[in-house]
């Protein structure tokens, strides 16, 4: 397979849905005996991710022989267009020297029939030494070409099919593709004709199509079986907004705050850990968490040894969250917000809070997402007259009680850059989305201001006047509808704050931190 790359794009598309209608008459496979666990994998190549995700699916076949007595696996995957597969998988492989032109030509012929096709299958553990061709079986093709897997009915239908085909005591749902974190301008009502979402990004046509927090929750909640674990193998998804939105539909969340390598999580480790720790799910998930981040560090070290200069910026992480304790954290965080809002009326307090906001740890260069723990901790320490030591300790403990495990790459740990979870910050209800240059992140190409009332101003570097438009919704119709905001009233601070937060991420600016 071609060497792993970082991907966290934000473009998508519209297709025909993969539902139980005329376009998808396929019946479930003959159900197997009930297992302890069933892994339900749901993904899309996202133009640039086919190589990595195909390897992930191959890894499902590499578990220990005995593991499959305890763990069953069902999968649905949509391939990118053959043009994207050629450009981002085959041509890049030739350019990087990881495959020959002859091999690329051979793979092109093999993969061309999978152009924008969706496959659905159950992993057969009797297949030894599985290779790419096991995923190119035309019998696996499901539904019409170019179907929309970002449709809520498609995901619900897949879960219902998979849980019938692979009955188990416990279910783990994996959603794999590009991720965009939480952004209000993506969080439009999923009932609307032009649906837009922030997970499972498609890249073929316009208008854009992908899951939002609300549409993903809706799809999962309508399924016949409850998911014990939801794992989003996608960038930027470990934010408090998504955690609260999904807390009532699953017991555990596996999410990453920063970017996720194209290689994805260690799926073989997931299969084996679930089998070896069948009676202790938290142990299994924690071990999987550790194995995945260690794999990413190992990949980065190998790439650095091969001369890849960017490999030293190996900023990856994974967190397993225990959702049953989020309500208790939300109660404490509401008190934090109540006092923050009241304290801001005092000029001395305001100056201290503004200084903290100005230097808040930004997770991603583009998005308005910041380290929730670092931000809250800095404020409680700076304002002992507002937050006594006992409250600060209670707030921290309530958050820690939600953590099953958390691992960060060596680069993040060695430079003290780890982040527990992100949260959105805004200025008087308006938030900023930046466009930093991909090749040189110190160059700002422009930025957008999304106003609470739906107005949008787009500023392009070098131009004097902004382009004024709308973003098709408002903060009251998006952020204020989130479970997190209803529990904590965080939007009160988004409206009240007058200080622009830090504009770039110390992790993504590629400055020589600590060197």
Residues covered by each model-derived region:
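Bacterial N-terminal signal peptides
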Residues: 3-13
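Bacterial Sec-dependent N-terminal signal peptides
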Residues: 11-35
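Loop/turn elements at helix/coil->beta-strand transitions in domains of secreted/extracellular proteins
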Residues: 35-38, 67-73, 166-172, 224-229, ...
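Active-site-proximal beta-strand/loop segments in catalytic clefts of secreted hydrolases
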Residues: 41-46, 76-80, 175-179, 232-236, ...
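Extracytoplasmic/secreted cell-surface and envelope-processing proteins
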Residues: 48-53, 82-86, 181-185, 237-242, ...
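N-terminal carbohydrate-binding/catalytic regions of secreted carbohydrate-active enzymes
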Residues: 49-82, 89, 93
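Catalytic-core segments of thiol-dependent peptidases
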Residues: 81, 92-93, 98-135, 139, ...
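Terminal, contiguous helix-loop blocks that mediate binding/assembly
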Residues: 160, 164, 188-515
């Amino acid at each position: 397979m071609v060497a792993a790359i970082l991907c966290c794009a934000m473009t998508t598309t519209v297709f025909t849905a993969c539902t139980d209608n005329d376009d998808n008459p396929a019946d479930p496979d003959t159900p197997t005996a009930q297992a302890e666990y069933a892994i339900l994998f749901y993904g899309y190549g996202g133009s640039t991710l086919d190589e990595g995700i195909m390897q992930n699916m191959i890894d499902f076949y590499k578990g220990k022989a005995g593991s499959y007595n305890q763990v069953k696996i069902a999968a649905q995957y949509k391939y990118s267009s053959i043009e994207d597969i050629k450009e981002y998988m085959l041509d890049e492989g030739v350019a990087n020297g990881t495959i020959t032109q002859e091999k690329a030509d051979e793979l092109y012929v093999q993969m061309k029939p999978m152009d924008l096709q969706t496959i659905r299958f159950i992993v057969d553990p009797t297949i030894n030494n599985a290779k790419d061709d096991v995923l190119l079986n035309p019998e696996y093709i499901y539904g019409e070409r170019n179907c929309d897997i970002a449709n809520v009915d498609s995901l619900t239908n897949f879960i219902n099919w998979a849980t019938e085909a692979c009955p188990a005591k416990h279910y783990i749902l994996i959603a794999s593709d590009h991720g965009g974190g939480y952004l209000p301008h993506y969080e439009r009502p999923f009932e609307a004709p032009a649906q837009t979402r922030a997970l499972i990004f498609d890249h073929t046509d316009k208008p854009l199509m992908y899951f939002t927090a609300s549409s993903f929750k809706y799809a999962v909640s309508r399924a016949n079986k409850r998911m014990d674990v939801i794992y989003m193998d996608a960038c930027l998804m470990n934010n408090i907004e998504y955690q609260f939105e999904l807390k009532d539909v699953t017991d555990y969340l596996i999410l990453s705050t920063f970017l996720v390598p194209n290689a994805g999580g260690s799926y073989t480790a997931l299969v084996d850990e679930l089998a070896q720790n069948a009676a202790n799910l938290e142990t299994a998930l924690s071990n999987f968490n550790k194995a995945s981040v260690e794999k990413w560090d190992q990949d980065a070290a190998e790439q650095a040894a091969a001369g890849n200069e960017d490999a030293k910026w190996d900023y990856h992480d994974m967190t397993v969250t225990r959702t049953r304790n989020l309500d208790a954290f939300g109660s404490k965080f509401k008190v934090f917000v109540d006092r923050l809002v009241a304290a801001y009326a005092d000029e001395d307090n305001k100056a201290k809070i503004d200084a903290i906001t100005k230097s808040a740890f930004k997770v991603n260069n583009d998005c308005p997402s910041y380290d929730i723990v670092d931000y809250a901790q800095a404020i409680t320490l700076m304002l002992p007259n507002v937050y006594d030591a006992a409250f600060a300790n209670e707030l921290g403990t309530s958050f820690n009680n939600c953590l099953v495990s958390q691992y960060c790459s060596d680069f993040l740990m060695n430079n003290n850059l780890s982040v527990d979870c992100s949260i959105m910050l805004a200025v008087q209800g308006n938030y900023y989305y930046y466009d930093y240059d991909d090749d040189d992140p110190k160059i700002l190409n422009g930025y957008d201001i999304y106003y609470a009332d739906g107005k949008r101003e787009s500023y392009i570097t070098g131009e004097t006047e902004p382009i004024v438009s709308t973003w098709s919704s408002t903060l009251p119709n998006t952020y204020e509808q989130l479970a997190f905001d209803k529990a904590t009233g965080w939007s009160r601070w988004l409206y009240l704050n007058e200080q622009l937060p830090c504009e770039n991420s110390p992790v993504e600016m590629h400055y020589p931190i600590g060197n």
